[in-house]
Amino acid sequence: WQPGGNEPLLKALYWVTETVTSPWGILTSAILCGWFLWCLRFRLKAAIGLALLLFAALVIGQGVKSLIKDRVQEPRPFVVWLEQTHGVDGKYFYSLHRKERSALVREQLQDQTLVPNWLRKHWQFETGFAFPSGHTMFAATWALLGVGLLWPRRHYKTVALLMVWATGVMGSRLLLGMHWPRDLAMATLISWLLVVVTCWLAQRWFGPLTPPPQEQQEIAARKPE
């Protein structure tokens, strides 16, 4: 991986990745959860239960991600690039505390014209390990939940938008120097497993995911949303 390229495209992808980055990821989750509940039209008790289940899936996914990161300890692409071009030893870099890593990134890039200022700040904020991608896991989980929960009710446009958004997040992680392709693949696999379990639990606890008979005619007449 090397920095550089089409800066307007990279900046656009940066804003896509920010929809998942803390603290904006919390707002994204709240909006998506509200939209899911509106689309599914569950009764209040089931809606609250489903909301808790959705957030539990996200929290568990992020916990699994953190556990794997601490075990595998794979350096991010931009850290490898710093090692190759600035002589920053990767093992030394990750032996530092997060604030010290951020300061080191800022110091090494202060005279670097190839890396725009907004990307430097993003690197300073994201100094953890690479494998697997937490951003990908977050976005892929929501996109796959859309397939599992919203597709049966013909919310095709919503599912398509979620897929495009998740793909944008994944592409941004590669092009911004944050992850390798294998990080994205593993994150997507974990997300898929989580979604399978989540949809199974949702059906077991809150009823079938397919619409009840009284909604069938309405859904059949509805334009895809």
Predicted regions and their residues:
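N-terminal transmembrane-helix/juxtamembrane module of multi-pass inner/ER membrane proteins
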Residues: 1-33, 65-86, 122, 221-224
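Luminal/periplasmic active-site loops of membrane-embedded glycosylation enzymes
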Residues: 3, 85-102
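Juxtamembrane/transmembrane-helix boundary motifs in multi-pass membrane proteins
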Residues: 6-10, 37-49, 53, 122, ...
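Hydrophobic alpha-helical transmembrane segments of multi-pass membrane proteins
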Residues: 16-20, 51, 55, 130
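Hydrophobic alpha-helical membrane-embedded or membrane-associated segments
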Residues: 22, 53-57, 187, 191, ...
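Alpha-helical transmembrane segments
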Residues: 23-27, 50-54, 157-164
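Interfacial segments of alpha-helical transmembrane regions
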Residues: 33-74, 80-85, 158
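Membrane-embedded catalytic cores of phosphoryl/pyrophosphoryl-handling enzymes
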Residues: 94, 99-225
